[in-house]
Curated annotation (Swiss-Prot):
GO terms for cellular component: NADH dehydrogenase complex; plasma membrane-derived thylakoid membrane. Disulfide bonds: none annotated. The gene is ndhC. It comes from Prochlorococcus marinus (strain SARG / CCMP1375 / SS120). The keyword Translocase applies. Keywords: Membrane, NAD, NADP, Plastoquinone, Quinone, Thylakoid, Translocase, Transmembrane, Transmembrane helix, Transport. It is a multi-pass membrane protein. This is NAD(P)H-quinone oxidoreductase subunit 3. The chain crosses the membrane at residues 6-26, 64-84, 89-109. It comes from the Bacteria. GO terms for molecular function: NADH dehydrogenase (ubiquinone) activity; quinone binding.
Length: 120
């Protein structure tokens, strides 16, 4: 059998981290009370009787706006530590940040040209 010396602790941690959630799920399935469908399946409407179904179709534009927002929100998360340590990092970090920003500007221009930012 192929073994890597020094990785025994990692393998043990990996096995335990896979076994604990699996054991929790199996235990929950075994000891949870079995309920019949009915009241549990209804949508909660703040004490009122539910009107209509719970499934609503959303316009795909909402997802496009959310995706663009998440991309630029992550950009802000990456740029903030760089801006805080700007004086200590030097010219190489400045060039790397410019490359990162330019890639995101190209992505924004692409989304703009494809109409992902237009609501029509």
């Amino acid at each position: 059998m192929f073994t890597l010396p020094g990785y025994d602790a990692f393998l043990g941690f990996l096995l335990i981290s896979a076994a604990v959630p699996a054991l929790a799920l199996v235990t929950n399935k075994l000891i949870s009370p079995k309920s019949q469908p009915g009241e549990r399946e209804l949508t909660y409407e703040s004490g009122m009787e539910p009107i209509g179904g719970a499934w609503i179709q959303f316009n795909i534009r909402y997802y496009m706006f959310a995706l663009v927002f998440v991309i630029f929100d992550v950009e802000t998360v990456f740029l903030y530590p760089w801006a805080v340590a700007f004086h200590k990092l030097g010219l190489l970090a400045f060039i790397e940040a410019l490359i990162f920003i330019s890639i995101l500007i190209v992505a924004l221009a692409y989304a703009w040209r494809k109409g992902a930012l237009e609501w029509s």
